[in-house]
Swiss-Prot record:
It comes from the Eukaryota. This is Cytochrome c oxidase subunit 4 isoform 1, mitochondrial. Belongs to the cytochrome c oxidase IV family. GO terms for biological process: mitochondrial electron transport, cytochrome c to oxygen. It is found in: Mitochondrion inner membrane. It comes from Bos taurus. The chain crosses the membrane at residues 99-124. Component of the cytochrome c oxidase, the last enzyme in the mitochondrial electron transport chain which drives oxidative phosphorylation. The respiratory chain contains 3 multisubunit complexes succinate dehydrogenase (complex II, CII), ubiquinol-cytochrome c oxidoreductase (cytochrome b-c1 complex, complex III, CIII) and cytochrome c oxidase (complex IV, CIV), that cooperate to transfer electrons derived from NADH and succinate to molecular oxygen, creating an electrochemical gradient over the inner membrane that drives transmembrane transport and the ATP synthase. It is a single-pass membrane protein. Component of the cytochrome c oxidase (complex IV, CIV), a multisubunit enzyme composed of 14 subunits. The complex is composed of a catalytic core of 3 subunits MT-CO1, MT-CO2 and MT-CO3, encoded in the mitochondrial DNA, and 11 supernumerary subunits COX4I1 (or COX4I2), COX5A, COX5B, COX6A2 (or COX6A1), COX6B1 (or COX6B2), COX6C, COX7A1 (or COX7A2), COX7B, COX7C, COX8B and NDUFA4, which are encoded in the nuclear genome. The keyword Transmembrane applies. The modification Phosphoserine is found at S56, S58.
Length: 169
C-alpha cells in the first residue's frame, strides 16, 4: 500500500517535471556556439568580437570620431572606446579574487564533516580494540616467536641474541 502511493507520487512528480522542462524550452533562447564569442582571457588578449555588439547613437558617433586623429580624442573618449572593445583591462583581469576563501572554506567544511563522521563511527560503529593489540599480548607473542626461532637466518630470530637474551646491536 505504502509502496504504491510512493511510486504514484514519484511518477506524478516525474511527469510534471518533464512537462515543465518541455514548456520551459520555448522561452529560453539557445546560444549559437558556432559564432565567435567574446571572452576576457589573459592568454588570448584579442577576442574575436567586440564586447559591445549593439551600439547606441552616442557610441556610433564616438566610433566615427575614432576614424579621425586620435590626438583630438579626450582621455575619457579613449577609455570609452576601449570599453566598447574590451570588458576588462589586463590589470582588472589580473586582480586577485576572493574565490580562494570559498575553496578553503569548503575544503575545511568537508574535512571537519569527515572528522565528525570518523569520531561518530569510532564511538558507535566500531567495537572495542582486540586484546591482541595490548602490550602484554604483543610481548608474549614476541617471546613465543623467539622460542620457536621463527626465520632464524634473515628474519625475526636472526636479530635476537639467545646467549645474552637481548636484541643484537
Amino acid at each position: 500500500m505504502l509502496a504504491t502511493r510512493v511510486f504514484s507520487l514519484i511518477g506524478r512528480r516525474a511527469i510534471s517535471t518533464s512537462v515543465c522542462v518541455r514548456a520551459h524550452g520555448s522561452v529560453v533562447k539557445s546560444e549559437d556556439y558556432a559564432l565567435p564569442s567574446y571572452v576576457d582571457r589573459r592568454d588570448y588578449p584579442l577576442p574575436d568580437v567586440a564586447h559591445v555588439k549593439n551600439l547606441s547613437a552616442s557610441q556610433k558617433a564616438l566610433k566615427e570620431k575614432e576614424k579621425a586623429s586620435w590626438s583630438s580624442l579626450s582621455i575619457d573618449e579613449k577609455v570609452e572606446l576601449y570599453r566598447l572593445k574590451f570588458k576588462e583591462s589586463f590589470a582588472e583581469m589580473n586582480r586577485s579574487t576572493n574565490e580562494w576563501k570559498t575553496v578553503v572554506g569548503a575544503a575545511m567544511f568537508f574535512i571537519g564533516f569527515t572528522a565528525l563522521l570518523l569520531i561518530w563511527e569510532k564511538h558507535y560503529v566500531y567495537g572495542p580494540i582486540p586484546h591482541t593489540f595490548e602490550e602484554e599480548w604483543v610481548a608474549k607473542q614476541t617471546k613465543r616467536m623467539l622460542d620457536m626461532k621463527v626465520a632464524p637466518i634473515q628474519g625475526f630470530s636472526a636479530k635476537w641474541d639467545y646467549d645474552k637474551n637481548e636484541w643484537k646491536k
